[in-house]
């Protein structure tokens, strides 16, 4: 269908250089997340100018960060020339300032039950960022306040549903006890409330402007995969993908797995025939679900297809999210080697055909690859040679080099490319440094650290922690022999002594407590441990911890990182914990500060003087937000250093892991992974990253620890290259390293200049966008 775009949409669509979308729901592609936020903001303001008393429904979570920032910035600086220019350049009429105070707001969804005053409730988010942030009238807001949802017996929800476990099957079955009867009546009361909420939305005339994200399973609001397209407001259980995504909000998968949600339905969104429905998505992790949602006919397995009958439906996408769509660039002359290889890989997959059997006819018969210039008999041969070169590079790893391995979080480096590190650390001629940029405290659950403190208390009382009796321990002894802690712990791993491992971990916990709180005696130590345990018992899961608790959790993760690289024989003096200050556990992460965040990186690079710097490379800015902010920080440090000294010989190795990955065309180095390397990864991860062993914050792709997902990714990447090069390339190879290959690690190699050019696009889009 030919899309009828508004003036704002036309302005952004023209910049994408794409033909008119052929999907049933039109889409617009932008370069990055900040531009995605600008597009959604300007389209929202454009609609409010035409509908100043309309009904809006806006999203929660991290996705709308730049939508919120842009909207607040534009409205706060409406009369400034730079804002007027931004609006005019992007199709928004500036003759009249939008006023939002007469709009009616409908909350999309909420966890149930949840205290609305908690910072991780969507009710809190809506109040803070929309009612207060946008100046909406609270009297015009229809919100989901869990504490005000009635139950028929006027008891607390926790008394009715112990541990907040709600069994919705009680709707349909007989009860077996008095408590189940109470629960059944309460569920019916919630159902009644949901029905009344739906009616209130209908009384407003339905939703006029809906903006929402799309979940990994395709969920719109909390309408998960399989939801009826005629669904209305209701309480429901979610699926694993949604629970994994919600784990960071609720304090772990252990909580989100049992927490229900209240959500408006798909028909609630589309009931108003004039509704504007915008779904926005960023990053390649969303590319597959975006493709299915736009290119498959109406299907309950893809909730967004329910929107296809609404003429006002749109998808706003970053390049990464639009990556798999069958789109054709207007400028057919812009075929880089990488782009040619990317499309030929897609063609092999679509045809399920080995690359060596790809013919010029196959290439010419495909709508997209037929546009590749100068197609001939050598096209596929050249393609295969370029793929082989990426693999051959793995045989030429550096010797007598200094490598600075950097990670945004603890475990990022291990999960990114540990088989490469196996080879780098084998040579005593190489010097390896490891630096983790943030303290990583958000991935440690309250329950885990509380249990660890209880074990520590038991060991102190049973006199199993002898070091605290040394006369100088509370003065400076606590800060000594940390390397010995690590060595002894790994000794206990070798001897399979789990008690010894726990004791070693508690030793490090004691050192951290004395360090953080400047404790001076055993009595003070015991009191402080009891105080912290009491704190954890009184706070809710997912609550933002105070700085001292954040530091305690972070120091636990730092010990885990030291264990990991000591596992590989690295001296802990070569392991750096930078604790960059922008990482605070806020809903929206701060922009890195030059003095606070950049200078420590400059100091580290000057101190280590590396030949190679590794980093988590997210060129679109749509991976985990911390990854992106760390990339910004390292880029700025290198930009400053490049002005002070020659950095031309320094190589950058970009890696990705469980959150985001390279495709086979953009990777420069493909490193073989043997079954032995996979076993080492799993053993290292489960023995060293103890707080992550239970996978409290899993990826939506796998219900288990990250090491298992990493192995799956490596195997999938190898499977792609088996298709391209043929299986015989591997099992008949003359090199035993390749014959033993069952997975592949992808890396991208850049010069500092090339990296800065990549990072500058990101840096300019944020720093130069006026909204920091």
Regions flagged by a language model, labelled:
Residues 2-7, 24-25, 264-362:
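ATP/nucleoside-binding phosphotransfer catalytic cores, i.e., glycine-rich phosphate-binding loops
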Residues 55-59, 208-214, 249-294, 314-317, ...:
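Glycine-rich anion-binding loop/nest that anchors nucleotide
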Residues 1-56, 72-80, 86-87, 93-94, ...:
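N-terminal glycine-/serine-/threonine-rich phosphate-binding loop
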């Amino acid at each position: 269908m030919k899309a009828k775009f508004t003036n704002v949409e036309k302005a952004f669509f023209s910049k994408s250089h794409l033909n008119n979308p052929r999907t049933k729901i039109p889409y617009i592609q932008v370069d990055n997340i900040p531009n995605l936020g600008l597009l959604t903001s300007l389209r929202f303001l454009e609609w409010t100018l035409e509908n100043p008393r309309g009904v809006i429904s806006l999203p929660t979570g991290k996705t709308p960060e730049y939508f919120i920032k842009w909207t607040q910035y534009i409205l706060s600086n409406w009369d400034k020339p730079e804002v007027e220019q931004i609006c005019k350049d992007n199709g928004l009429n500036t003759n009249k300032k939008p006023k939002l105070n007469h709009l009616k707001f409908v909350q999309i969804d909420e966890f149930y039950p949840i205290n609305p005053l908690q910072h991780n409730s969507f009710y809190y988010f809506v109040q803070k960022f929309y009612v207060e942030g946008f100046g909406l009238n609270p009297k015009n807001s229809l919100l989901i306040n869990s504490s005000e949802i009635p139950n028929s017996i006027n008891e607390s929800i926790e008394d009715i549903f112990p541990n907040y476990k709600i069994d919705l099957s009680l709707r349909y079955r007989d009860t077996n006890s008095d408590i189940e009867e109470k629960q059944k009546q309460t569920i019916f009361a919630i159902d009644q409330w949901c029905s009344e909420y739906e009616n209130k939305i209908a009384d407003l005339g339905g939703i006029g402007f809906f903006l929402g994200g799309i979940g990994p399973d395709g969920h719109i609001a909390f309408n998960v995969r399989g939801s009826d397209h005629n669904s209305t407001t209701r309480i429901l259980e979610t699926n694993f993908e949604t629970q994994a995504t919600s784990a960071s909000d609720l304090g772990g998968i252990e909580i989100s797995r049992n927490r229900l949600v209240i959500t408006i339905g798909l028909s609630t969104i589309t009931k108003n025939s004039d509704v504007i429905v915008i779904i926005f998505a960023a990053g390649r992790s969303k590319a597959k679900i975006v493709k299915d949602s736009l290119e498959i006919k109406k299907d309950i397995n893809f909730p967004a297809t329910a929107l296809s009958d609404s003429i006002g439906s749109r998808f706003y996408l970053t390049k990464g999210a639009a990556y798999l769509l069958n789109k054709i660039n207007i400028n057919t002359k812009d075929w880089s080697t990488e782009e040619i290889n990317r499309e030929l890989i897609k063609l092999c997959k679509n045809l399920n055909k080995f690359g060596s059997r790809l013919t010029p006819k196959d290439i010419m018969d495909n709508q997209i690859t037929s546009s590749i210039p100068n197609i001939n008999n050598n096209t596929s041969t050249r393609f295969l040679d370029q793929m082989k070169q990426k693999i051959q590079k793995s045989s030429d790893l550096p010797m007598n080099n200094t490598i600075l391995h950097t990670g945004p979080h603890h475990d990022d480096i291990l999960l990114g490319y540990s088989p490469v590190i196996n080879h780098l650390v084998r040579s005593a001629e190489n010097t390896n440094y490891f630096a983790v940029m943030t303290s990583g405290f958000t991935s440690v659950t309250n329950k885990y650290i509380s249990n660890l403190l209880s074990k520590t208390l038991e060991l102190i009382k049973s006199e199993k922690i002898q070091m605290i009796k040394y006369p100088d321990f509370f003065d400076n002894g606590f800060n000594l022999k940390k390397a010995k802690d690590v060595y002894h712990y790994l000794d206990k791993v070798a001897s399979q002594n789990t008690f010894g491992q726990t004791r070693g971990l508690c030793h490090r916990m004691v050192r951290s407590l004395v360090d953080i709180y400047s404790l001076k005696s055993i009595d003070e130590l015991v009191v402080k441990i009891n105080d912290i345990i009491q704190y954890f018992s009184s706070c809710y899961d997912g609550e933002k911890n105070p700085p001292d608790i954040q530091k305690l959790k972070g120091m636990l993760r730092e010990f885990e990182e030291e264990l990991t690289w000591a596992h590989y024989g690295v001296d802990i003096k070569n392991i750096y914990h930078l604790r960059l200050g922008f990482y605070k556990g806020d809903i929206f992460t701060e922009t890195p500060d030059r003095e606070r965040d950049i200078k420590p990186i400059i100091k580290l690079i000057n101190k280590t003087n590396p030949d190679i710097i590794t980093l988590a490379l997210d060129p679109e800015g749509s991976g985990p937000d911390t990854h992106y902010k760390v990339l910004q920080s390292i880029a700025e440090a290198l930009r400053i250093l490049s002005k002070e000294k020659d950095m031309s010989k320094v190589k950058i190795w970009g890696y990705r892991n469980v959150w985001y990955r390279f495709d086979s065309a953009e990777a420069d180095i493909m490193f073989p992974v043997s079954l032995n390397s996979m076993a080492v990864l799993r053993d290292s991860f489960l023995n060293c990253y103890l707080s992550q062993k239970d996978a409290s914050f899993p990826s939506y792709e796998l219900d288990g620890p990250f090491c298992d997902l990493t192995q799956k990714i490596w195997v999938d990447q190898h499977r792609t290259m088996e298709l391209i090069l043929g299986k015989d390339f591997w099992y008949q190879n003359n090199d035993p390293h390749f014959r033993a290959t069952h997975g592949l690690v992808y890396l991208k190699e850049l010069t500092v200049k090339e990296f800065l050019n990549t990072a500058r696009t990101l840096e300019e889009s944020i720093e130069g966008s006026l909204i920091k």
